[in-house]
């Protein structure tokens, strides 16, 4: 979830025969420019996206993921997921730390409930998933596996017991911080703000949170965190970590992106960096233009939200998203190739075993690269990687195999740690 939620305020996959067919067959055969060979590879993969903010729409707009409305501008629906062979989605459980002061956990529960309700409403197309076995089961049943990740450690309200409860409710990763520094983890979003009390990374309690996540089998997510928090998390975690929705800082100099040294560290840790589709993290010109209009954009959002409050209306993410889209439309979208550039860079620096997809769908209003308008466009990534010489095996890893591997290892480490006595906390 990015500025398309105030990120700017802190300055934010038929047959084997087809896969190995001749180059002539690899020519484009559909309107989107995706070849039969690319479709065969894409459709044989378990495609996993590690970050989508669609629960905000479930809750604020009463959006139905089964919607077939052609006018819907959202990135994810069951039809769009099927069209893009999206096999598993980690739905982001993001609680705005400003508008939900005093009830972070309560709003977290509301968002979790919204995901369960969608799965209950569409049992033929979607199922809740809590493990790698569940993801593979959903794939065999041709259903979307719905997983959940908390975006921002403030949701646990500084309580290990709440963290455990969220795991019991199905949360399978947690981003240690969002764009706000919380009471135990520094964020990249406000690291330069002298008014914020920082901790030089993770506090002792923050390290305890990481270790408890390891014990539970909850993936540690280092997107959004300050650089020192990243290094503390890497040093503390006994299991592989992920960056659920981050890109390469060497290509786009944004604090939310990952440096090459960090990429190498994630590779050594066995983790995965899942590339964010937000244009500001993929294209330097877009990032710079975003920063240039940030003050005016934030003022417009503030004024609009205050107007709603004065009218006695409840302010929602969708209200802010409406204004954000208007401002993002002022900046030209970069070409689709910038997304592939970041995947390619991370693969070259960290290795093809350590890169995946973390779209930030439905959290980057109108600000994805040209040609990436919804989950239905995911096969274009496979075509682009094929065009750059990636093997079918490596493409399947990038599409989801790497995340599945990391999740399996997190589960293994959890079983090992749970054989040990539980400390009183």
Language-model-detected regions and their locations in the chain:
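Bacterial N-terminal signal peptides that target proteins for export
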Residues: 1-12
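Bacterial N-terminal signal peptides
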Residues: 10-22
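Divalent metal-binding pocket/active-site signature
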Residues: 168-242, 247-256
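N-terminal hydrophobic targeting/anchoring segments and the immediately downstream early-domain regions
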Residues: 25-197, 253-425
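A broad helix-preferring feature
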Residues: 3, 18-19, 220
């Amino acid at each position: 979830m990015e500025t398309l939620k105030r990120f700017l305020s802190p300055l934010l996959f038929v047959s084997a025969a087809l896969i190995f067919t001749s180059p002539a067959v690899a020519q484009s055969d559909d309107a989107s420019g995706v070849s039969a060979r690319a479709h065969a590879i894409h459709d044989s993969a378990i495609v996993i996206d590690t970050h989508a903010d669609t629960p905000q729409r479930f809750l604020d707009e009463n959006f139905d993921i089964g919607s077939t409305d052609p006018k819907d501008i959202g990135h994810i629906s069951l039809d769009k997921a099927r069209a893009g062979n999206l096999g598993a989605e980690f739905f982001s459980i993001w609680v705005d730390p400003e508008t939900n002061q005093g009830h972070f956990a309560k709003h977290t529960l509301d968002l979790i409930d919204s995901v369960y309700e969608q799965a209950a409403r569409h049992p033929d197309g979607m199922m809740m998933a809590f493990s790698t076995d569940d993801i593979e089961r959903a794939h065999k049943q041709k259903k979307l596996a719905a997983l959940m990740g908390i975006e921002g450690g403030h949701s646990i309200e500084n309580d290990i017991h709440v963290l455990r409860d969220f795991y019991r409710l199905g949360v399978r990763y947690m981003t240690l911080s969002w764009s706000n520094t919380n009471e135990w983890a520094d964020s990249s979003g406000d690291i330069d703000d002298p008014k914020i009390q920082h901790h030089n990374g993770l506090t002792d309690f923050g390290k305890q949170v990481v270790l408890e996540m390891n014990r539970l089998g909850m993936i540690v997510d280092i997107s959004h965190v300050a650089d020192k928090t990243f290094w503390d998390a890497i040093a503390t975690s006994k299991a592989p970590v992920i960056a659920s929705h981050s890109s390469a800082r060497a290509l786009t100099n944004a604090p939310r992106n990952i440096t090459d040294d960090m990429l190498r560290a994630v590779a050594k840790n066995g983790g995965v960096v899942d590339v964010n589709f937000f244009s500001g993290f993929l294209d330097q010109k877009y990032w710079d233009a975003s920063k240039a209009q940030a003050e005016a954009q934030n003022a417009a959002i503030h004024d609009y939200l205050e107007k709603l409050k004065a009218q006695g209306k409840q302010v929602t993410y969708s209200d802010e998203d409406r204004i954000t889209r208007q401002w993002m439309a002022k900046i030209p979208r970069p070409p689709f190739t910038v997304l592939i550039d970041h995947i390619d860079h991370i693969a070259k620096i960290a290795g093809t075993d350590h890169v995946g997809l973390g779209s930030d769908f439905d959290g980057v209003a109108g600000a994805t690269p040209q040609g990436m308008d919804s989950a239905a466009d995911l096969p274009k990534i496979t075509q682009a990687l094929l065009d750059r010489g990636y093997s079918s095996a490596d493409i399947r890893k990038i599409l989801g195999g790497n995340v599945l591997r990391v999740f399996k290892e997190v589960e293994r480490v959890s079983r090992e740690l749970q054989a040990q006595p539980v400390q009183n906390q």
